[in-house]
């Protein structure tokens, strides 16, 4: 299948078993996701982003295998989601999917526009209402009450799913990663090796991603992981600047 649009459309429901879907270009595994695929009696659609594969010939392998017709679209339809019954009106909820721990909370005032925005990232499965496919979702607010969901900023890769962490506004550019007028934002997160097919037989490690556009998008640091595995289930880095020590300090959960 040649990718011509931004998203693949997967019909899903809550009443079938999870299937593994692998994406290959020739013999190279590009990604793997886990969804409740249901083309017989679907409840709604999910949209898998494939714009980065545009023009490529992608093989999509389903486990267990079923016959399926693939649809592509440039315009996801989430118009129904905020009208569904029982959705909370006060607490933040994602348009679709499963979410958990808030991560990397920070406030930032743009050096260019002067606009102050509160940023909240969170553990997020954009493809289903159960744990899995863990990304960092993103929402913003100007008053801490009204939140708007933005595009996810980190997706699973060959180091693993993207587990919890923290964010630092590097206003002094101690990292040297700043480019442009805005302060560079650093995210420290756990790459959960062994939690997806791409990261088979790898261990949990700690990684960095950085943003030069006020936290809207992030680039994964090319030297990741910055801390190798230091023990079973080491995860959830919290990083702060310690003025007395004149250095950053990281706390990790260890089991």
Each predicted region: which residue ranges?
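Beta-rich carbohydrate-recognition and catalytic domains
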Residues: 2-237, 241-255
